[in-house]
Curated annotation (Swiss-Prot):
Signal peptide as annotated in the record: 1-27
Coiled-coil ranges from the UniProt annotation: none
Cited Gene3D superfamilies: 1.20.1250.10
Subunit organization: Component of a hexamer of two molecules each of IL6, IL6R and IL6ST; first binds to IL6R to associate with the signaling subunit IL6ST. Interacts with IL6R (via the N-terminal ectodomain); this interaction may be affected by IL6R-binding with SORL1, hence decreasing IL6 cis signaling. Interacts with SORL1 (via the N-terminal ectodomain); this interaction leads to IL6 internalization and lysosomal degradation. May form a trimeric complex with the soluble SORL1 ectodomain and soluble IL6R receptor; this interaction might stabilize circulating IL6, hence promoting IL6 trans signaling.
GO MF annotations, alphabetized: cytokine activity; growth factor activity; interleukin-6 receptor binding
A cellular-component GO term for this protein: extracellular space
Residues with attached carbohydrate: 73, 172
SUPFAM superfamilies: 4-helical cytokines
Designated name of the protein: Interleukin-6
Family of the protein in this entry: Belongs to the IL-6 superfamily.
Disulfide bonds: 72-78, 101-111
PANTHER family: INTERLEUKIN-6
Lineage: Eukaryota, Metazoa, Chordata, Craniata, Vertebrata
Length: 212
């Protein structure tokens, strides 16, 4: 596998992000992607919970964009006409009308459950990405750890935790083994589809969370 060069979303951003998100869900005064003045600047209002979620998701999206750029630069997967076939073999989370996240039929509680459940389902795919970027593994790790922190924070906002579905560890382990056993072309295509789908899911989540 060709290695991927490290972009601006690299070691420094990763190290800072990892230190901030590991202890708990957003326990530190400064989140990844935030400047300290955004949190407690003199003579200014600190960011609200919603604003911090917004900024945190955009931080993750920046990381995804960097990884997608590297993926597209090293292969033609972003332009492949065969991606629909590969996508049929994946079960990537998507937003639907019944999830209550769209403007029409918006339901805050139902939508929040969908967002959290979807993020939990994406975790196995983010784990798969950890072995796909030799030189940019820190970027993939930062996206993964920042997503874990986002899940923890959103779970604290949810009113109906019992409605949140958590994937079975054995199912995830089996899926991960299956993905890693694919041939090189399918692994490259899977990487592209995961990044694209996760970006779309986060963008939809961000729009919905701004209504909450």
């Amino acid at each position: 596998m060709n290695s991927v060069s490290t972009s601006a979303f690299g070691p420094v951003a990763f190290s800072l992000g990892l230190l901030l998100v590991l202890p708990a869900a957003f326990p530190a005064p400064v989140l990844p992607g935030e400047d300290s003045k955004d949190v407690a600047a003199p003579h200014s209002q600190p960011l609200t919970s919603s604003e911090r979620i917004d900024k945190h998701i955009r931080y993750i999206l920046d990381g995804i964009s960097a990884l997608r750029k590297e993926t597209c630069n090293r292969s033609n997967m972003c332009e492949s006409s065969k991606e629909a076939l590969a996508e049929n073999n994946l079960n990537l989370p998507k937003m639907a009308e019944k999830d209550g996240c769209f403007q029409s039929g918006f339901n805050e509680d139902t939508c929040l459950v969908k967002i959290i459940t979807g993020l939990l389902e994406f975790e196995v795919y983010l784990e798969y990405l950890q072995n796909r970027f030799e030189s940019s593994e820190e970027q993939a790790r930062a996206v993964q750890m920042s997503t874990k922190a986002l899940i923890q924070f959103l779970q604290k906002k949810a009113k109906n935790l019992d409605a949140i579905t958590t994937p079975e560890p054995t199912t995830n382990a089996s899926l991960l083994t299956k993905l890693q056993a694919q041939n090189q072309w399918l692994q490259d295509m899977t990487t592209h589809l995961i990044l694209r789908s996760f970006k779309e899911f986060l963008q939809s989540s961000l729009r919905a969370l701004r209504q909450m």
